[in-house]
Regions:
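Alpha/beta-hydrolase-fold enzymes
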Residues: 1-40, 162, 166, 183-292, ...
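Catalytic-loop region of hydrolases
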Residues: 16-94
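Short beta-strand/loop motif that positions the catalytic acidic residue
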Residues: 331-333, 337
Length: 756
C-alpha cells in the first residue's frame, strides 16, 4: 500500500457511517418544514377568527337564498331555512320532490352536508331535485328548547311544501348525525310533512353496543350521569360550550388527535395545507347551546335513552312515538363508525317492535344500509360514499316510497354493462332491497337484559346526582358564573386555545408569514430515500401505534370499570332495579286510537278485496309472485312505471304508490281470497287485461323468479292472465309484437332514474 493510498481508505470507510450530506439535507428540510407548519397554524387561526366573525358562518360549497329565519317564529330559535342555489348547467325540475338536508348541531357549525360539491346536496342536484338546507347560528336564542326546535323544523317543512305545490311527493329529508334524532322527532309529531327520511350516522338507541367495542356509551356512567352537564351549563352562564362535545369525539381516537393529524400535515406540508385548512374551518367552528337544550339531550337521549321507547313527552302531554312515522325510513351507518356504531343506529327497531309483522302492522317501511369501512365523518363528506350510497338513495327515492311495509336491507352491486337489463339501471350500481328480519338487526349486536339493567342503573344514579347537584352545589355556582367569566372559560377551552395561540396578534409569531414566503421561494425538500427521513417516518408510526395501544387499553379499562360498578347487585338494588327480574325497559304499548285506526283499515281492505281492475290485478299478481323471493330492485320499478304510463297515464305517481301498498296489505290480510279475486278484476276490462298479461310476463322475464314457491305462483297467475288475453288484430297483415321498450335513463335530471 502506497503512502498516497492510505489516507483515502479510512475516509471511504467513514462515509457510510457519517452521511453528512443526508443529515444536512434532512435538517434544512426540517427547518423549512417547521416554518411552513407554523405558517399553516397561523393561517388556521386567521381563518378561525374570520369564520367566527361572520353573522351566519357555514362551510357549504353552494350558494344560498334565505327562505325562513327561525328567530322570527312565535317560539324563536336560532335555526334558518335556506334554498341551495344549483350550480350553473344543472337542470332542476321543480315538479320533483325537494330534498331538505338537516345538519347536526353537535358542537360544530353547519354545512357538513354540503361540504363538497360531490355530497348529499350534490347528488340530489344531479338527480334534478330542488334542495334546501336547515342550518343554525352559533348563538342560541335565549330560552329556546328542543321542543321549540322541533316546532320550527316542522314550520320549515310546511314552507318547503308550500313552495312546491306541484311536486310529485312530500320532501325527502336527510338528517345527519345528531340531526337524525331531531328529524325523527319531527316526523313522529308531524308525519304528514315527510316523504322518505334518510338518517345518516344518527344514534337512536343510545345504550346499544357490543362488548369490547363502542366505548363512548360508557362515558355517562363513569362521570356519574348528567350533573356535569348541568355544571358546565351553569359555568357558561346558561350556555353550554359545544367544544365539550367535540372534545368527546376527539378523545375517542387519541392517536389521531394528539399525533397523526398534525404529523400528516407536517410530513406533507407542501401539498396538504389546503385540505387541512378546509376541514379545520368546520372542525374548529364551535357553537353554543342553551344549557336547557343540552340537559334535555343528555337526560332524555344519551343517558335516559327514551326516544326509542316513546318515553319522551312533550309539553302538550303527547309521547314522541317513532311508530307514528308514516314515511319510509332509510338508516345509513357504518361498521367502522365508532361514534354511531350500527347497534346505536339500528337497535331502536328492537326496542319498538316484536317482529317484522309488527313493523308491517304499523304500516312502516324501514330500510338499512351498512358500510363496511367508512368512518363517521365519511358518511357525510366522503366523495366515494356520495357517488355510491347517497347517489343511489337520491336516484331511487320513488322506489323507496313505493316499497311495501316491512324491513329491508339496501344491497348495491356494480351494474353489469353487458346485461340485457342494463338500460333499466339508472346509475353505476344496481340497488336491491332485500327483505330482512329483526334477527338480522340483532346480528350487528344488541344488549342483554343484564346490560340493560346496568344502563338503567346509570340513569337512576344520574337522576340522584343531578338532584344533589341542584340542591347543594348549583346555588353556589350560579351567582359568580356571569357572562364575562363564561366567555373567558370558553377562550381557555383546550380545543379553542390552539386556535387563539397562533393568531397574528401573538408577538412571537410576527415574522412567521414572511419567513414562510422566503422558504417557499428557496424550498429544498428532502429526498424520500433519505435515511433520517425514513427514520422519522418509522418513529411517527411507532408513536401512532403507541397511542392506539393506549386508547385500546383505556377503552378496556373504562368498560371493565363500568360493568364492575353498575353491574353490582347491591348498587342496582339501592336504586330499585332488583325489585323485578324483568327488563328495566318495556316496549311501549299501542294506544286505543291507533288500534281503532288499524281495525278500520282492515275492515276497509277486506271490503275492497275484490275491487279494482286489471292494473290492480297485475300489481297484486306481481307482488304475490315476488313475495317469496323477498327482493325488489329498480329494474322492476322502471317497468312498473312504464306500465303506469302506458295503461293509465291519468294515474298520478302518488296514487300509483298508494295502489301498490294497498295491494300488498290486501295480500297480507287474506292472501287466498285476494288471489281468487283476480279473475273477476281482469274481466272488468278485457282489453286492458290482455295488455297486463303481456306486461306481467315481461316483468317476470326481466326480474326472474328464484324460489320454487315463486315459480309455482307464476304458473298459477300466468294461467289466470293468459286465459283472458284478447287476440290482437294484425295490422297490414303482420302481427304486432307486444313488448315494453324501456328508455335509457338520463343521469341529469334523473326523473327517469326511478327504481324498483
Amino acid at each position: 500500500m502506497t503512502s498516497q493510498e492510505s489516507p483515502s481508505k479510512p475516509q471511504a470507510a467513514l462515509v457510510p457511517f457519517f452521511p453528512w450530506k443526508d443529515a444536512w439535507s434532512y435538517w434544512v428540510d426540517a427547518s423549512q418544514r417547521g416554518v411552513l407548519f407554523l405558517d399553516v397554524m397561523q393561517q388556521r387561526s386567521e381563518q378561525y377568527e374570520e369564520h367566527a366573525a361572520k353573522p351566519a358562518p357555514h362551510v357549504l360549497k353552494f350558494g344560498t337564498e334565505l327562505v325562513m329565519d327561525g328567530r322570527k317564529l312565535a317560539r324563536p330559535v336560532n335555526y334558518i331555512l335556506v334554498r341551495i342555489v344549483a350550480p350553473k348547467g344543472l337542470e332542476i325540475n321543480d315538479k320533483k320532490r325537494p330534498f331538505v338536508i338537516f345538519d347536526p348541531r353537535a358542537g360544530h357549525g353547519p354545512g357538513i352536508g354540503g361540504f363538497k360539491a360531490q355530497s348529499e346536496i350534490g347528488v340530489a342536484f344531479q338527480a334534478g331535485h330542488p334542495c334546501y338546507f336547515v342550518g343554525f347560528l352559533p348563538e342560541p336564542v335565549s330560552g329556546q328548547t328542543i321542543e321549540d326546535i322541533v316546532m320550527a323544523e316542522a314550520a320549515f317543512l310546511e314552507r318547503v311544501i308550500a313552495l312546491h305545490p306541484e311536486a310529485d311527493g312530500k320532501p325527502a329529508v336527510i338528517g345527519n348525525c345528531q340531526a337524525g334524532w331531531a328529524v325523527m322527532m319531527v316526523a313522529a309529531k308531524r308525519p304528514e310533512l315527510f316523504g322518505p327520511i334518510i338518517v345518516a350516522g344518527s344514534p337512536l338507541s343510545y345504550w346499544a353496543g357490543v362488548h369490547g367495542e363502542n366505548p363512548m356509551r360508557y362515558t355517562g356512567g363513569l362521570l356519574g350521569g348528567t350533573w356535569l352537564t348541568a355544571l358546565m351549563g351553569d359555568i357558561g352562564a346558561g350556555k353550554f360550550d359545544g367544544a365539550w362535545l367535540v372534545s368527546n369525539f376527539e378523545n375517542l381516537n387519541p392517536a389521531n388527535t394528539y399525533w397523526t393529524k398534525q404529523y400528516n400535515l407536517y410530513s406533507k406540508v407542501d401539498t396538504e395545507a389546503p385540505r387541512y385548512l378546509e376541514f379545520e374551518k368546520w372542525w374548529g367552528g364551535h357553537i353554543l347551546l342553551n344549557a336547557e337544550e343540552m340537559q334535555f339531550i343528555a337526560d332524555e337521549l344519551f343517558i335516559g335513552n327514551k326516544l326509542s321507547t316513546a318515553g319522551i313527552v312533550t309539553s302538550d302531554g303527547q309521547s314522541v312515538d317513532l311508530r307514528s312515522i308514516r314515511s319510509p325510513i332509510i338508516v345509513f351507518c357504518s361498521k367502522a363508525d365508532n361514534i354511531t356504531p350500527p347497534p346505536q343506529a339500528l337497535d331502536w327497531m328492537l326496542d319498538l317492535y316484536d317482529s317484522v309483522e309488527d313493523i308491517r302492522a304499523h304500516g312502516q317501511t324501514i330500510i338499512y344500509a351498512v358500510h363496511e369501512s367508512i368512518g363517521h365523518l365519511g358518511i357525510f363528506v366522503s366523495g366515494s360514499v356520495a357517488k355510491k350510497e347517497h347517489d343511489e338513495f337520491a336516484s331511487n327515492i320513488d322506489l323507496i316510497e313505493v316499497l311495501p311495509p316491512g324491513l329491508y336491507e339496501a344491497v348495491m352491486t356494480p351494474k353489469e354493462e353487458g346485461s340485457p337489463t342494463a338500460d333499466l339501471v339508472g346509475g353505476d350500481y344496481l340497488v336491491r332491497f332485500e327483505a330482512r328480519t329483526l334477527d338480522d338487526i340483532r346480528a350487528f349486536g344488541c344488549n342483554s337484559v343484564d346490560d340493560e339493567r346496568k344502563f338503567a342503573a346509570v340513569a337512576r344514579i344520574s337522576e340522584i346526582n343531578l338532584g344533589l347537584y341542584r340542591t347543594f352545589v348549583q346555588p353556589w355556582v350560579k351567582p359568580w358564573a356571569n357572562a364575562g367569566f363564561a366567555e373567558w372559560m370558553r377562550k381557555l377551552h383546550p380545543l379553542r386555545l390552539p386556535y387563539e395561540m397562533f393568531t397574528p396578534a401573538n408577538p412571537l409569531l410576527k415574522s412567521v408569514s414572511s419567513m414562510a414566503d422566503y422558504v417557499r421561494e428557496n424550498r429544498q425538500p428532502v429526498s424520500p430515500d433519505n435515511a433520517l427521513w425514513q427514520a422519522q417516518h418509522r418513529m411517527g408510526k411507532a408513536i401512532e401505534s403507541s397511542l392506539k395501544a393506549y386508547g385500546d387499553m383505556r377503552d378496556r379499562f373504562v368498560e371493565s370499570v363500568f360493568h364492575a360498578v353498575y353491574g353490582s347487585p347491591v348498587l342496582q338494588a339501592v336504586v330499585g332495579l332488583k325489585a323485578s327480574d324483568a327488563s328495566p325497559r318495556h316496549r311501549p304499548g299501542v294506544d286505543a286510537v291507533y288500534r281503532a285506526f288499524v281495525a278500520h283499515r282492515i275492515e276497509e281492505l277486506t271490503r275492497n278485496i275484490a275491487q279494482g281492475g286489471p292494473r290492480e290485478a297485475a300489481i297484486r299478481a306481481l307482488l304475490y309472485i315476488r313475495i317469496p323471493d323477498g327482493v325488489a330492485d329498480e329494474r322492476g320499478f322502471r317497468l312498473l312505471e312504464h306500465m303506469r304510463e302506458e295503461t293509465g297515464g291519468e294515474l298520478s305517481l302518488a296514487a300509483f304508490k298508494a295502489m301498490v301498498r294497498d295491494q300488498f296489505l290486501t295480500l297480507l290480510l287474506d292472501e287466498r281470497r285476494a288471489i281468487e279475486a283476480i279473475p273477476a278484476m281482469l274481466d272488468a276490462e278485457p282489453e286492458l287485461a290482455s295488455r297486463m298479461a303481456v306486461t306481467l310476463r315481461k316483468l317476470i322475464e326481466v326480474l326472474g323468479v328464484e324460489s320454487k314457491v315463486g315459480k309455482a305462483r307464476f304458473a298459477e297467475i300466468a294461467a289466470m292472465f293468459e286465459s283472458r288475453k284478447v287476440p290482437k288484430a294484425p295490422k297490414n297483415g303482420a302481427p304486432k309484437e307486444d313488448r315494453i321498450q324501456p328508455a335509457r335513463p338520463a343521469r341529469a335530471p334523473a326523473a327517469s332514474r326511478n327504481l324498483s
